[in-house]
Each structure stands twice: as structure tokens, then as C-alpha cells.
């Protein structure tokens, strides 16, 4: 099963796990509206994240030349401009290959202060039919 980040966050939140506030959008205007709402709740820093089924989004490059499928922004206008650069464009990462993936949705969320970043995956070991939890400092 492949889930976008926003879908995984919805599942976690549904089961009581705290996740950063935010929303999903498919237009720059909607991205700005989400940001304006978050500003009204006291947020000051925002993550704009391309939603594709591939890792390495932050270091990715769009076919249009726009850099980075994950951007940290300080204002609603910056979020709007980032959304314009991402939505409807093809993001190329190490995992997508040269064809890349079309970005149709963005996650706009409050950006937490990051002290340390870890990547977590739960996989099914087919040999033992058991889940395997993997953690790494790199995605």
C-alpha cells in the first residue's frame, strides 16, 4: 500500500498521535488560505511539501527548473509562490528516475523546530510474514 504523507498523517491523527497542524491543497490560492489560517493560530514557519510516492523530495528538482519539492516558508506569500512552482509540475528525485512524478497535491503544515531528523518505515518481511521496523538518519 502506498500512502501520501498527508494520508499517513490523517491516519496517525485519527488514532491520537499528535501531528503538525496543516492541510492539503491543489492550488496556490488554497495553499495561501491554509497558511493564513495557521498564522491566525500563531504559526510562524511553514513546510510546503510535494505529495508524490517517492523519497528525496526536498533535494528533488522540477523539470521546470524549480528546485526542491519541500520548502520552508515564513509568509503566506512565500507559500503561494512555492505552491506555484510545484503544483502541476514534474518532480524528479533519486527514486523517481528521469521521468519524475507529477505533483497534484501539496501538504502545507506548521514547520516544527527540528533538532534531529529520522526516517521510519514499517515493512512486511515476506520470509517470516512479520512486520519489520526500520529507522535511518537518511531517507
Q: Which sequence ranges carry the predicted segments?
A:
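A conserved helix-loop-beta module that forms one wall/lid of the active-site cleft
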Residues: 1-37, 41-44, 50
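ATP-grasp fold ATP-binding core
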Residues: 5-13, 41-61, 92-114, 120
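A broad, structure-centric signal for solvent-exposed, well-ordered loop/edge residues
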Residues: 8-10, 32, 55, 79-80, ...
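Glycine-rich phosphate-binding loop of ATP-grasp-fold ATP-dependent ligases
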Residues: 19-22, 48-82, 119
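Short beta-strand-to-turn element immediately C-terminal to the catalytic PLP-Schiff-base lysine
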Residues: 25, 72-75, 123, 134-135
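Catalytic core of tubulin tyrosine ligase-like
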Residues: 76-96
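Flexible glycine-/small-residue-enriched beta->alpha junction loops
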Residues: 117-139
Amino acid at each position: 500500500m502506498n500512502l501520501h504523507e498527508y494520508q499517513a498523517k490523517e491516519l496517525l491523527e485519527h488514532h491520537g498521535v499528535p501531528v503538525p497542524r496543516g492541510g492539503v491543497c491543489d492550488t496556490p490560492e488554497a495553499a495561501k488560505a491554509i497558511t493564513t489560517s495557521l498564522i491566525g493560530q500563531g504559526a510562524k514557519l511553514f513546510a510546503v511539501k510535494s505529495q508524490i510516492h517517492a523519497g528525496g523530495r526536498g533535494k528533488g528538482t522540477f523539470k521546470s527548473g524549480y528546485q526542491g519539492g519541500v520548502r520552508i516558508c515564513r509568509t503566506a506569500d512565500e507559500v503561494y509562490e512555492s505552491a506555484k512552482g510545484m503544483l502541476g509540475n514534474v518532480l524528479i528525485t533519486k527514486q523517481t528516475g528521469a521521468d519524475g512524478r507529477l505533483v497534484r497535491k501539496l501538504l502545507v503544515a506548521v514547520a516544527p523546530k527540528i533538532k534531529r531528523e529520522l526516517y521510519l518505515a514499517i515493512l512486511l518481511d515476506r520470509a517470516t510474514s512479520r512486520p519489520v521496523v526500520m529507522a535511518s538518519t537518511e531517507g
